[in-house]
Amino acid sequence: MAGHSKWANIKHKKAAADAKRGKVWTRLIKEITVAAKLGGGEFDSNPRLRLAMEKAMDANMPKDNIQRAIQRGVGGLEGANYEEIRYEGYGLAGAAIIVDCLTDNRTRTVAEVRHAFSKHGGNMGTEGSVAFMFTHCGQFLFAPGTPEDKLMDAALEAGADDVVTNDDESIEVTCPPNDFGAVKAALEAAGFKAEVADVVMKPQNEVSFVGDDAVKMQKLLDALENLDDVQEVFTNAVVEE
């Protein structure tokens, strides 16, 4: 099955995240803390914690930092109490945006998110206003040149929902979010290591932006991404370089 070209977009986002490693670590520490608080400190029985720990290790976070975040989550260390909040809104041309936050001050966070939207030509929506345009799923992206037939066989046998070959020949595998860990383990056991693997809100349809509109849309997305309380930004906007 064919799909949109997204390898460049994914690699650009990954490079930008690598350039802000300190901020990435801060976000991951929050995620590990909340995951441990909600599901316990044993990663074998806590898929969310396991995923957060894998991301932290991929980001070269020291093990001591990871363990302290887990201990803080299960009550062994003092620290801020974070709550999860999701905001929804619109960018240029009605592009849908989901902003997932972890915050210890809801009033501060909503003000900052609203300001970012309004400053860059977007606006916040109500709860549920755009979430229906996305599918909650596990997502794996493999580099162009990955053996398509072998990957498809391994993915479907592992419990994946779909395998899509994009226009740039990268391959995308999706699965139910609860099966993410099992599918990831099965794919790696079959010799397939994804460049990107995460549980995401995947847009059901995409809106492409070029030229000045692409620049404006990227500024809005960057403004949201750069907020301290923001963990993830999902959008159906595809910003063409």
Swiss-Prot record:
Short name of one Pfam family: TACO1_YebC_N
The terms under GO molecular function for this entry are: DNA binding
One biological process term in Gene Ontology: regulation of DNA-templated transcription
Q: Which UniProt keywords apply?
A: Cytoplasm, DNA-binding, Transcription, Transcription regulation
At the top level, the lineage of the source is Bacteria
Where does the protein end up? Cytoplasm
Cellular component terms, GO, for this chain's entry? cytosol
Q: Which InterPro entries match?
A: Integrase-like_N, TACO1_YebC-like_2nd/3rd_dom, TACO1_YebC_N, Transcrip_reg_TACO1-like, Transcrip_reg_TACO1-like_dom3, YebC-like
Family membership, please give it: Belongs to the TACO1 family.
What NCBIfam families does the record tag this protein with? Answer: PRK00110.1 (NF001030), PRK12378.1 (NF009044), YebC/PmpR family DNA-binding transcriptional regulator (TIGR01033)
Q: PANTHER family given for it?
A: TRANSCRIPTIONAL REGULATORY PROTEIN YEBC-RELATED, TRANSLATIONAL ACTIVATOR OF CYTOCHROME C OXIDASE 1
Protein name per UniProt = Probable transcriptional regulatory protein Rmet_0785
